[in-house]
Every structure is written in C-alpha cells, then in structure tokens.
Amino acid sequence: MIKKRIIPCLDVKDGRVVKGIQFKGLRDIGNPVDLAMYYNEAGADELVFLDISKTEEGHSLMLEVIEQTASRLFIPLTVGGGIQSLDDITQLLNHGADKVSLNSSALKNPQLIKQASDKFGRQCICIAIDSYYDPERKAHYCCTTGGKKMTNIKVYDWVQQVEQLGAGELLVTSMGHDGMKQGFDIEHLANIKSLVNIPIIASGGGGNAQHFVELFDQTDVSAGLAASILHDRETTVQSIKEVIRQGGIAVR
C-alpha cells in the first residue's frame, strides 16, 4: 500500500509567508526558510512553496528563498506561482526545486505541460487547479490568477487533458473550502480521482486531523495539503499523522 503524505503549503509573497481565507485577506506568518526548516524537522513529507508575489523583485526574492531552503531540506520541494516558460522551470529546478507546479500558464498554453514533461520528466510536473463550483452552471471550473478569474474550462475535462499531456501529479484546491477548516471537498476529489491515474494532492479545508482521516478513508488521493492549521500551530504534522494511523491508514 502506498503511504499517504502530509504536505505543508507556504504561500510566499515578496519573501514572506502569508495566509488568507478563500484566497483573500492575507496576513504575515513568517520567514519561509525558517518555516521550511521547522516543517522539515516536524515530519512533513514534502513542502509546497507558492510564489504569489506581484513584482519581479518578489519573484527574484523567491529564487533566493528556494536556494537557501533547498540546501538544508531533506524532503522534496515543489514550487509554483508565476511560472510562464521552460526557462522559468529550468531556473527553479537549478535553484533546488524538485518539482514545479503550473496553473494559469498551463491553462493559457496547455502545450507547456507536454514540453515541460518531455524536457524535465513527468515526475517534475505538477498541475495546480483552483477549482470553483459555479452554482448557476452547476459545474466546477478552473480559475486563474490566484483564484481571481474563472475560466470556461471545466475541471473534470481539464484533469484528463493534463494527464494526457504529461502531468505527473495534480494539486487540487477546492476554493470554496480554502482556509475554512471545515473539511475537504470529498465528493469532488473522489470524482477527479475516478478520472485520472496520476497522484492527487488535496488542498482546501483541512481543519483538524480527523478531516485528513476522512480524506484518505473516502478518497484515493495520495496526499493532503495543510496550511492554516499548521501555521497557526493549532496542531502539528506528527499529531495529524498519529490520528491517521489510529484510523488504520498507512502514512509516511
């Protein structure tokens, strides 16, 4: 049995870790390198850095953060946010990222997925999906620009397309659940998993350890992403894992 993973997510803006609720109202959490080291020691299986800087200076700071972090980190590091080209991916991997996460750029240019997968290997390419349920159209749609713009691309169509193009992993954020700490969007995640064979990281809604038990018990996703509950020190990676083990689920 493949063991489940717990992955802290750090949203980095202009060199600082921030966190909002449903992608709004950002507050400062701390220094990304320090936090990465804390999670490295605390039993995280991987780390995700999402660069939400708006400026070139912010993106440049991110490269420094990645380099400083990767040199001391013993777990895989995925970096996403603002990646537009193969050159951007090369730069991130050269600075120490193990995987890159593509979102808006892949929606605008799906061939970037194939080109990146061919050049760097499928295992390096994670596709991030900000999924928004539109009650009027009764369907989930992909959003771009940090969840600000809804596209006409349906999530269930997109996940199948990106797998065919060479994505090695999906990072699915249910926007209506993000930062709410009310539990994961189980039904939606299970539906996505039924359509693809690549691993899925679930994001949005993990408010306590029991939510992760439900996630792994009721879906076949590979990993759960956590931000708010870990950054606010409401619980720890090890505490979450202990509860998952007690639920009879294999975890790393």
UniProtKB/Swiss-Prot annotation:
Keywords: Amino-acid biosynthesis, Cytoplasm, Histidine biosynthesis, Lyase. Pathway: Amino-acid biosynthesis; L-histidine biosynthesis; L-histidine from 5-phospho-alpha-D-ribose 1-diphosphate: step 5/9. Its main location: cytoplasm. It comes from the Bacteria. GO terms for molecular function: imidazoleglycerol-phosphate synthase activity; lyase activity. Pfam families: His_biosynth. The active site is at residues 11, 130. It catalyses: 5-[(5-phospho-1-deoxy-D-ribulos-1-ylimino)methylamino]-1-(5-phospho-beta-D-ribosyl)imidazole-4-carboxamide + L-glutamine = D-erythro-1-(imidazol-4-yl)glycerol 3-phosphate + 5-amino-1-(5-phospho-beta-D-ribosyl)imidazole-4-carboxamide + L-glutamate + H(+). It is found in: Cytoplasm. One of its GO terms (cellular component) is cytoplasm. Its EC number is 4.3.2.10. One of its GO terms (biological process) is L-histidine biosynthetic process. PANTHER family: IMIDAZOLE GLYCEROL PHOSPHATE SYNTHASE HISHF, IMIDAZOLE GLYCEROL PHOSPHATE SYNTHASE SUBUNIT HISF/H IGP SYNTHASE SUBUNIT HISF/H. HAMAP family: HisF (MF_01013). Belongs to the HisA/HisF family. Heterodimer of HisH and HisF. IGPS catalyzes the conversion of PRFAR and glutamine to IGP, AICAR and glutamate. The HisF subunit catalyzes the cyclization activity that produces IGP and AICAR from PRFAR using the ammonia provided by the HisH subunit. This is Imidazole glycerol phosphate synthase subunit HisF. It comes from Staphylococcus aureus (strain Newman). The lineage of its organism: Bacteria, Bacillati, Bacillota, Bacilli, Bacillales.
